């Protein structure tokens, strides 16, 4: 018998072949089972975690197949409906963190537990300026003299010092430069300087954190001396790191969301009062209520790290207010600025002003004046409205992504309106579709 034939039929060779066949069979079976699972598993139409609609199976046509859009749609569908998608994405994020990455999906892993979105210079700055100016030009009532613009910097500017040292945005305030350019191009509008107010509040916050660390160090040293360690070794003290605990309600921005906190909105409210000649109500005078400690916002959805602790949402309320809040699109009338049903959902920030509506009409019988305000805004304003209602008998809140009739026409039809405020945050103003319809 040929020697090669003997080797090919040896027990070891047969075992190897069986192992190879078994391995291939198992892999094939896994792929088949996984494919069947992908096809028959229940499909969601909306991702609460990402707060967006999931892709549906694309409609086939020869044209779509030819131009590649059909296969692209299939890939998007499979990606959106991949089984155990969220756990796998968390695993991916954790791996990237372990490899030392400090930026994931345009999110900086910043100090004190903050996740901060990178800033992209707006591509439609001229359009923003033009639309703002068109609004004022179209107003024919006395409110024309009281049009104010409030551009709100996000955490990448206010908390710039918290960014990783390797971040290109560290020490570079491009967002503030853009704000100043927009303000300079609108000389006839009154500027609300939210940046200076937030910058001062951030400096105070950092100072308070430093004092807390100093006090903690002093206490630790005192405890060490009193413990009588003969070898002089210093015990490891618990770190006091203001802001690292996401339950801290005194930060200016949420750790896992792009919005400012209620405290941050209060700082913005102070800046508005300064520009509008109003006397702000002291922060201590509001009744504060913590409504959740488990808020995971828009940045959390981009990062996909299910191990991140939730943020705290705190409401500031004035019990003396007598409010009537009307939603013309639904016909709903209520006496509160909040829809607490959203606290049972992931998108908890939507509790402010009941999420998205083209127009909200707010009347306060106990306001300290008979002035009326038209507020044209993005979602940042939703958490500042509870402060503004104290000073205006009536506030008309417009979200021009959905309101299609032009706020300038509304203002001209309501000569009792005394003030107009345009409030937008700098992170989303460039992509906010509502900017195109503000006049």
Task: List the predicted regions and their residue ranges.
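Extracellular glycan-modifying ectodomains
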Residues: 1-439
């Amino acid at each position: 018998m040929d020697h090669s034939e003997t080797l090919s039929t040896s027990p070891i060779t047969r075992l190897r072949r069986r192992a190879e066949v078994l391995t291939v069979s198992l892999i094939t079976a896994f792929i088949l089972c996984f494919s069947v699972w992908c096809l028959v598993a229940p499909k969601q139409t909306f991702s609460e975690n990402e707060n967006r609609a999931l892709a549906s199976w694309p409609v086939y046509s020869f044209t779509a197949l030819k131009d590649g859009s059909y296969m692209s749609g299939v890939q998007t569908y499979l990606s959106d409906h991949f089984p155990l998608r969220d756990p796998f994405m968390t695993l991916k994020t954790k791996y990237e963190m372990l490899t030392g990455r400090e930026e994931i999906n345009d999110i900086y892993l910043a100090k004190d537990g903050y996740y901060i979105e990178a800033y992209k210079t707006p591509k439609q700055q001229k359009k923003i300026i033009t639309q703002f100016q068109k609004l004022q030009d179209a107003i024919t009532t006395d409110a024309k003299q009281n049009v104010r613009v409030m551009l709100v910097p996000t955490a990448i500017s206010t908390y710039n010092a918290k960014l990783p040292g390797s971040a290109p945005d560290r020490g570079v305030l491009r967002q503030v430069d853009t704000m100043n350019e927009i303000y300079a191009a609108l000389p006839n509008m009154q500027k609300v300087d939210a940046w200076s107010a937030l910058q001062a509040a951030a400096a105070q916050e950092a100072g308070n954190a430093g004092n807390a660390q100093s006090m903690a160090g002093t206490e630790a040293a005192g405890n060490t001396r009193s413990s009588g360690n003969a070898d002089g070794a210093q015990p490891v003290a618990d770190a006091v790191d203001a802001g690292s605990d996401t339950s801290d309600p005194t930060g200016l921005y949420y750790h896992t969301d792009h919005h400012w906190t209620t405290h941050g909105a209060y700082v913005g409210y102070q800046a508005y009062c300064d520009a509008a000649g109003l006397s702000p109500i002291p922060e201590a005078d509001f009744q504060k209520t913590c409504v959740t400690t488990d808020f995971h916002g828009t940045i959390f959805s981009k990062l996909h790290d299910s191990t991140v602790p939730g943020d705290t949402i705190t409401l500031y309320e004035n019990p003396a207010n007598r409010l009537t809040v009307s939603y013309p699109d639904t016909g709903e009338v209520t006496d509160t600025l909040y829809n607490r049903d959203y606290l049972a959902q992931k998108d908890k920030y939507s509790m402010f002003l009941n999420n998205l509506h083209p127009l909200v009409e707010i009347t306060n019988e106990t306001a300290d004046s008979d002035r009326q305000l038209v507020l044209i805004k993005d979602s940042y304003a939703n958490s500042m409205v509870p402060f503004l209602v104290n000073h205006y008998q009536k506030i008309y809140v417009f979200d021009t992504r959905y309101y299609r009739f032009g706020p300038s026409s509304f203002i001209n039809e309501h000569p009792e309106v005394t003030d107009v405020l345009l409030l937008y945050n700098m992170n989303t103003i460039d992509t906010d579709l509502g900017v195109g319809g503000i006049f």
